[in-house]
C-alpha cells in the first residue's frame, strides 16, 4: 500500500528540514500556490548521461521546471562555476527550465524577508502562467496521486510514453 498524498507531502518536506531557507521558500511556494493538480518533488534526483547525480531543490515534472534555492554557500567563487556546470548538465539531461531564488544580495547579506517573499510571489505567478501555457498546448496532465503508481491505466491504453512521466512502485508493473 502506498502512503496517502498528505503523508507524501510531509515526507517530501522532511527531506529539507535541516536547510532552513530552502524549507521556508519551498513550503511557502507550495502553500501559496495551493494547486493540488501540480506534482512537486523536493530533492529530485537527476542522473546525467555520464551517470553524475544531482538533486534539484524543487521540481515540477509536469511543467518541465525545477528550482534551486541559492543559500550562502552558492555565493562562493568555486560554487558559482560548479553551479553553472551543474545547471547545464541538468538541463541537458532533462530539458527542464531552471529558476533560482537567492536569499542573499550582491553584498552577500541575507535579503530582507519581505524581499524574499516578493521573489516567491513572482515564482508563483510564473508557475501559474506556465501551467496555463501547458494547458493551452494540451501538454499538461494533472497530478493524480492516487493513480500515479497504478499500471492499469497504461495497460488499458496499451503503451507507455516518456512524456507522460509514468512511475511504478514495482518493476513487474512496467513489464
Predicted feature residues:
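Nucleic-acid endo/exonuclease domains
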Residues: 1-175
Amino acid at each position: 500500500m502506498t502512503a496517502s498524498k498528505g503523508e507524501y507531502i510531509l515526507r517530501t518536506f522532511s527531506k529539507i528540514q535541516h536547510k532552513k531557507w530552502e524549507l521556508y521558500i519551498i513550503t511557502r511556494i507550495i502553500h501559496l500556490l495551493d494547486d493540488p493538480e501540480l506534482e512537486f518533488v523536493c530533492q529530485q534526483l537527476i542522473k546525467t548521461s555520464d551517470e553524475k547525480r544531482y538533486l534539484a531543490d524543487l521540481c515540477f515534472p509536469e511543467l518541465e521546471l525545477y528550482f534551486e534555492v541559492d543559500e550562502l554557500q552558492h555565493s562562493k567563487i568555486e560554487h558559482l562555476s560548479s553551479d553553472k556546470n551543474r545547471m547545464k548538465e541538468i538541463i541537458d539531461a532533462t530539458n527542464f527550465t531552471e529558476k533560482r531564488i537567492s536569499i542573499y544580495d550582491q553584498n552577500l547579506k541575507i535579503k530582507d524577508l519581505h524581499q524574499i517573499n516578493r521573489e516567491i510571489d513572482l515564482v508563483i505567478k510564473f508557475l501559474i502562467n506556465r501551467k496555463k501555457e501547458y494547458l493551452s498546448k494540451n501538454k499538461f496532465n494533472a497530478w493524480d496521486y492516487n493513480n500515479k503508481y497504478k499500471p492499469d491505466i497504461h495497460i488499458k491504453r496499451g503503451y507507455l510514453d516518456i512524456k507522460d512521466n509514468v512511475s511504478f512502485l514495482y518493476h513487474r508493473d512496467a513489464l
